[in-house]
Amino acid sequence: MRTQTREIQTHLTPQKAFEILAEGNRRFVSNLRLNRNLLQQVNETSDGQFPFAIVLSCIDSRTGAELIFDQGLGDIFSARVAGNVVNEDVLGSMEFACQVAGSKLIVVLGHTKCGAVKGACQHVHLGHLTGLLNKISPAVHDVERAGGADLPAAEFVERVALENTRQQMRAILERSPILEHLFTEGRIGIVGGMYSVDTGEVTFFEQAFQTPAPAAAMAAAR
């Protein structure tokens, strides 16, 4: 399997970057992962990296993005925080990935049976965790207002996990003028996804891609 290079990264579109990840997850679910020489990839990436996507996911030990999407060293950036919440550090990391390092896609990846989401639903208070869970509270309140309060507890948590992922995804473009500009120009795309810890499958939603502006398209074609 070929290691990501600047040339490969430059010619990828956001849509193609998404397709690579979707295909990788299908391989993962089918247990047909690509054969990679990881030591060779260590050597080939020692002088630089050209990842084509950045994935924001939870710290849950079952949700490692490189494994879920069957990617190797140097292929993707991985940002992880409980509840896949967006903060200034995450936004800064995404701005570096896309504006500086040239990544073409942002993925916000929630997952089923999320402990952080469950904690937010139960209004847990525990040290610094309290502030983190407060970032998930808007999703809890929105699901409650939509009639979700009458759902069984497990189903309510899953609804909140999905809504939280949607809200975090929208917050990225709302809070980062840099990323919003790249998106408007068609230089990056953004998608949401939910990973099933039962099946290993990622269900994607709210895929957002813009037609590249003429100048951006010409630059990518060079």
Regions found by a protein language model. Give the residues of each.
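Conserved functional hotspot residues or short segments at active or partner-binding sites
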Residues: 108
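Glycine/small-residue-rich phosphate/adenosyl-binding loop
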Residues: 50-52
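Short helix-loop-beta junction
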Residues: 68-78
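Long, hydrophobic/aromatic N-terminal blocks
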Residues: 38-41, 54-59
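Divalent-metal-activated hydrolytic enzyme cores
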Residues: 1-48, 74, 83-101, 115-222
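Acidic/His- and Gly-rich active-site-bordering loop/insert found
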Residues: 65
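Short glycine-enriched loops at secondary-structure junctions
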Residues: 57-62, 82-85, 111
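Short acidic/polar active-site loop segments enriched in Thr and Asp
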Residues: 104
